[in-house]
Each structure stands twice: as structure tokens, then as C-alpha cells.
Swiss-Prot record:
It is an enzyme of class 2 (transferase). It comes from Geobacillus sp. (strain WCH70). It holds the Pfam family SPOUT_MTase. S-adenosyl-L-methionine binds at residues 76, 108, 127-132. One of its GO terms (cellular component) is cytoplasm. The gene is rlmH. It comes from the Bacteria. This is Ribosomal RNA large subunit methyltransferase H. Its EC number is 2.1.1.177.
């Protein structure tokens, strides 16, 4: 399986980089993992609804340009479906069974994802009704992907 994590913004925090590197290393025996960063739009504090949509649109165009044509796309969004770790593992296993060898996870910027990105997504996944920093979400996502592979292989880890 080839996993693409497409995320808005550049990761700067060293402690997050270390965690991400650790999970990429752990995942290397299960899947190829690529993390693709697309530039975020600098935004002033007080934006109109129209300005927010324009920013999401520009970031969305960059995201869409990085999605492999044949990838199954999972957008991370608050309004997405919540799953337990076991349900998430089962859904990844099902995708593999149906020959979906490329999966692209999309993490938006601070304003979320554009309508176009959400339309391109095959599904929307929510980790919580809470909002997380998009940089931290990369680490959380990688940990859950790793956990899913361990669950699917019956290997100890997730309890």
C-alpha cells in the first residue's frame, strides 16, 4: 500500500517532526508513506467569508494538484464520519482487499478544506468534533494508520 498524506503548511516544530519520523519508520514494513506539504496562504486575523473561501480555494488547488489520479481520497474534516481505531483498521483492510493500493489523506489548513477538495474526496473522516492544529494532525493520523496495520495483522499494540 502507498499512503500519501497531503497537508497544508510547513511543519516547523521539531518535536512533531521527531514523532512523525518515528511513525514513518514504524510504518515502513507495512506501507510506503509520503508526506507532501503544500504552501499555506498567509491570512490576516479578521477575514470576510469571501476571503476565507478564496484562501481555501487557493490551498485546495494546490492540494488537488498533488493527489495521485488513481488514489482513494480521505479528507480529514470535522464534519466527516467518526470511527473507532478498529473500524478505521477494517476500512483500510477493505480498501486493500478491493485493490485500492494508493490512499491519499488530506489535511487542510487552519480554515479547513475547499468544496472542490471535499468533492474529490471518496470519504470524509473525523477524528473528533474538536479542532486540532493541522501540524499535530499529521502525527495523530500516522499513529492511527500504524495502529490500524497492527490491528489488521493481529499484532500487539493497540490495547
Amino acid at each position: 500500500m502507498h499512503i500519501h498524506i497531503i497537508s497544508v503548511g510547513k511543519l516547523k516544530e521539531k518535536y512533531l517532526m521527531q514523532g512523525i519520523d518515528e511513525y514513518k519508520k514504524r510504518l515502513s514494513s507495512y506501507a510506503k508513506v509520503d508526506i507532501i506539504e503544500v504552501p499555506d496562504e498567509k491570512a490576516p486575523e479578521h477575514l470576510s467569508e469571501q476571503e476565507m473561501e478564496q484562501i481555501k480555494q487557493r490551498e485546495g488547488e494546490r492540494i488537488l494538484a498533488k493527489i495521485p489520479n488513481d488514489a482513494y481520497v480521505i479528507a480529514l474534516a470535522i464534519e466527516g464520519k467518526m470511527k473507532s481505531s478498529e473500524q478505521f483498521a477494517a476500512s483500510l483492510d477493505k480498501l486493500a482487499t478491493y485493490g485500492k493500493s494508493k490512499i491519499a489523506f488530506i489535511i487542510g489548513g487552519s480554515l479547513g478544506l475547499s468544496k472542490q477538495v471535499m468533492q474529490r474526496a471518496d470519504e470524509a473522516l473525523s477524528f473528533s468534533k474538536m479542532t486540532f492544529p493541522h501540524q499535530l494532525m499529521r502525527l495523530i493520523l500516522l499513529e492511527q494508520i500504524y495502529r490500524a496495520f497492527r490491528i489488521n495483522r493481529g499484532e500487539p499494540y493497540h490495547k
